[in-house]
Amino acid sequence: MTKKLHIKTWGCQMNEYDSSKMADLLDATHGYQLTDVAEEADVLLLNTCSIREKAQEKVFHQLGRWRLLKEKNPDLIIGVGGCVASQEGEHIRQRAHYVDIIFGPQTLHRLPEMINSVRGDRSPVVDISFPEIEKFDRLPEPRAEGPTAFVSIMEGCNKYCTYCVVPYTRGEEVSRPSDDILFEIAQLAAQGVREVNLLGQNVNAWRGENYDGTTGTFADLLRLVAAIDGIDRIRFTTSHPIEFTDDIIEVYRDTPELVSFLHLPVQSGSDRVLNLMGRTHTALEYKAIIRKLRAARPDIQISSDFIVGFPGETNDDFEKTMKLIADVNFDMSYSFIFSARPGTPAADMVDDVPEEEKKQRLYILQERINQQAMAWSRRMLGTTQRILVEGTSRKNIMELSGRTENNRVVNFEGTPEMIGKFVDVEITDVYPNSLRGKVVRTEDEMGLRVAETPESVIARTRKENELGVGFYQP
């Protein structure tokens, strides 16, 4: 009988990537098939996130539901991974003794051995160590699920912002070698992937090793990925202003595969609050980056992260944030009320902004961002946009849906063979959360590049001299 695996994922795109790798790994080693129904599963895995408020309590609430399943089926294996697991460790078993496996983001590749250990002697396993790059070396080949894919290029963060748990739960920055990344992307391209999203907690800090032992920059990597035939769009998430160097901006100037959309968190428009947050940049420095980006790519649209009600934030500080929002003309944002994360320096600060004031500031900020986003959408009315068709529309299964370069969802009438390909669509209607249009050109008329083999991608980045010694050539 087929063994079943159920994974519940909370949090960021990195967690989504990790969960997909868990599924591929346990399919390869144990033959587990994914199921959306927890009651059917032989193994339940909870991939957690510690960014939001009351993250720990949310975990134990979910585990309480799964405990009932374990009581009915004592052989059921329950595992907790992700950032809450890394943060809480053995404390999870103290509150939920029925949990069999606790693993961190850097030890998910050891899941097969952990499951074997639990199956063998029923003793629980806790592994929340940070074994650096080993995780990527032991994962199976990537498996495409549609025309878009996430590819993790690095883990961890060295910035230690005062409100953030990432350095404590995912460790410090570790970059994958460039060859490993390029080979994975080429494998995905060969399976029909057209758009890759390069992932990292601080993705533009990537400093991976090249095959010849030299250290590459993020700008180098972007150009190498753009050269892979079949990959027509590149996104990356999430970047830090302090690492947004001029060579990255130059890639926007000369590399059309890099989309005209950037998520660049700023958190606040007040230098005083930024200093309290440990952000190491000013609002003016942030605006200087945006100014240079728009000189290189005039149509680029920017999204960001904001925290309102940070300890010590005054009305004047908040007004400076609102001014930054207007000056940059952000297209969208992920914005939240401050809530202290245990173990961070900000948790020891006096949370002196009244809750109602926090809510009011968040409402004002989000309303302004929504107005700006709608203005950006209205500018697209009557224009022709290139859409990567991802599948059928959620609103109408008789229609197709895809995304523009600037991350707008567009619904339109089309045929099934368009799925996974690009189409040019004239935008005819604008709505708060989506656009509507009509197809004016199909991919057959675009002359796009055809995917090449992964081996040829690696070979193309190298060239041998007369002695047969390879050297790097982008």
Swiss-Prot record:
Could you say which residues bind [4Fe-4S] cluster 2 here?
A: 157, 161, 164
User: Subunit composition?
Assistant: Monomer.
Q: What's its EC?
A: 2.8.4.3
**Keywords from the named record:** 4Fe-4S, Cytoplasm, Iron, Iron-sulfur, Metal-binding, S-adenosyl-L-methionine, Transferase, tRNA processing
**Catalytic reaction(s) noted:** N(6)-dimethylallyladenosine(37) in tRNA + (sulfur carrier)-SH + AH2 + 2 S-adenosyl-L-methionine = 2-methylsulfanyl-N(6)-dimethylallyladenosine(37) in tRNA + (sulfur carrier)-H + 5'-deoxyadenosine + L-methionine + A + S-adenosyl-L-homocysteine + 2 H(+)
Q: Where is the TRAM domain?
A: 378-441
Q: Using the record's annotation, list all stretches that form the MTTase N-terminal domain.
A: 3-120
Q: What subcellular locations does the record give?
A: Cytoplasm
By what name is this protein known? tRNA-2-methylthio-N(6)-dimethylallyladenosine synthase
Which species does the entry assign this protein to? Salmonella enteritidis PT4 (strain P125109)
Q: Which Gene3D superfamilies match?
A: Methylthiotransferase, N-terminal domain, tm_1862 like domain
Q: Which family does it belong to?
A: Belongs to the methylthiotransferase family. MiaB subfamily.
InterPro entries of this UniProt entry?
Answer: Elp3/MiaA/NifB-like_rSAM, Methylthiotransferase, Methylthiotransferase_CS, Methylthiotransferase_N, Methylthiotransferase_N_sf, MiaB_methiolase, rSAM, rSAM_horseshoe
List, in alphabetical order, the Gene Ontology terms for molecular function in this entry: 4 iron, 4 sulfur cluster binding; metal ion binding; N6-isopentenyladenosine methylthiotransferase activity
Kindly state what the record says about how the cofactor is bound: Binds 2 [4Fe-4S] clusters. One cluster is coordinated with 3 cysteines and an exchangeable S-adenosyl-L-methionine.
Role summary: Catalyzes the methylthiolation of N6-(dimethylallyl)adenosine (i(6)A), leading to the formation of 2-methylthio-N6-(dimethylallyl)adenosine (ms(2)i(6)A) at position 37 in tRNAs that read codons beginning with uridine.
Residue stretches making up the Radical SAM core domain = 143-375
Q: Where does [4Fe-4S] cluster 1 bind?
A: 12, 49, 83
